[in-house]
Amino acid sequence: MDLENKVKKMGLGHEQGFGAPCLKCKEKCEGFELHFWRKICRNCKCGQEEHDVLLSNEEDRKVGKLFEDTKYTTLIAKLKSDGIPMYKRNVMILTNPVAAKKNVSINTVTYEWAPPVHNQALARQYMQMLPKEKQPVAGSEGAQYRKKQLAKQLPAHDQDPSKCHELSPREVKEMEQFVKKYKSEALGVGDVKLPCEMDAQGPKKMYIPGGDRSTPPAAGAMEDKSAEHKSTQYSCYCCKLNMKEGDPAIYAERAGYDKLWHPACFVCSVCHELLVDMIYFWKNEKLYCGRHYCDSEKPRCAGCDELIFSNEYTQAENQNWHLKHFCCFDCDSILAGEIYVMVNDKPVCKPCYVKNHAVVCQGCHNAIDPEVQRVTYNNFSWHASTECFLCSCCSKCLIGQKFMPVEGMVFCSVECKKMMS
């Protein structure tokens, strides 16, 4: 398929999750409606991950595409219908007998994801070492956390040009090369193993970048492996604390098997969130989630949340923007050369600011223009003028004078305050 056809096929998937309720805004949001180029709801401005959108198949497709053309093809299966790679997510179901007065009932716990290991006891141990609120039990807070991190850490628009907004053929080609590069140089999936088992495999099976660092025994020397095993101390690469004997650890092949992590310490070095499904990116001796690895390689547009592959883009307020996306957060009008105000780190044009965000003057009860001087005390504001910042009793101008605040009123003296009380 040539680049022009790829560009024509692009779309942000506006039908996905349409009308889903917002878990954050509740009834204030009319339901999810994807903005035509931002990755947010048009109604409440929250992300799709904040809405109760059923995306299990879509997420499995996204992760499946991430693992396509990598060494992790054992974690995907291609659908016969369309050939799209699907993530073979490992689901773990645990059954525990619960004693009742008459009969023994079975309590079933389903984990929406679990480490792909043959030893279920090891997988169970791994889960128990995660914070309770982050264990992906179906229908729980932990399952919602995993869903949110899948969306946040592994954005589809960081790997699939068809999920981006109006890329040029040149940008599509550059993005494909970028994705191919990080798949071959940085992408990995953690392994859950017991440290003593890894030690027993010996140095020949250890992956260490730059060669084997172990020192072979001298000729004729006897190795006391039992003594070596007893004295071995394993410490977590993140928190530096020792591993407890019998506890599982996570290894990352790209980091080398001389490094290991507690399950709860296998986190992104930037956002410090658990690496979802143990999917990591390794760079400069650090673990990253997909989002923050890409951020370390490319500028990201603060408007559309996509990586910038264009040679021309703008920088404002310590953020990067596609030229066409430096727009008012409220009305989407282009802001180049216009006056704007930052509201919660989002640029807003002057008319929208006055209409939707400006504070109201306690004196004249009109909105205060962002370019006009004002006086603020606690949550109250006034125009810094002789017409507005006045004593609430005698109308004396208080600019540059001492005053006594009482809720939304100000007084020049105790006498004036008493007269109004």
Curated annotation (Swiss-Prot):
One Pfam family here: PET
Lineage, highest ranks first: Eukaryota, Metazoa, Chordata, Craniata, Vertebrata
Biased composition (Basic and acidic residues): 155-164
GO BP: any one term: negative regulation of cell population proliferation
SMART domains tied to this protein: LIM (SM00132)
Keyword Zinc in record: yes
Organism from which the protein derives: Saimiri boliviensis boliviensis
Classification via InterPro entries: LIM1_Testin, LIM2_Testin, LIM3_Testin, PET_domain, PET_testin, Pk/Esn/Tes, Znf_LIM
Domain called PET: residue spans: 92-199
Boundaries of every LIM zinc-binding domain copy: 234-297, 299-359, 362-421
PANTHER family: LIM DOMAIN-CONTAINING PROTEIN, TESTIN
Predominant location category: cytoplasm
GO cellular component: cytoplasm; focal adhesion
Oligomeric and partner information: Interacts via LIM domain 1 with ZYX. Interacts (via LIM domain 3) with ENAH and VASP. Interacts with ALKBH4, talin, actin, alpha-actinin, GRIP1 and PXN. Interacts (via LIM domain 2) with ACTL7A (via N-terminus). Heterodimer with ACTL7A; the heterodimer interacts with ENAH to form a heterotrimer.
Entry protein name: Testin
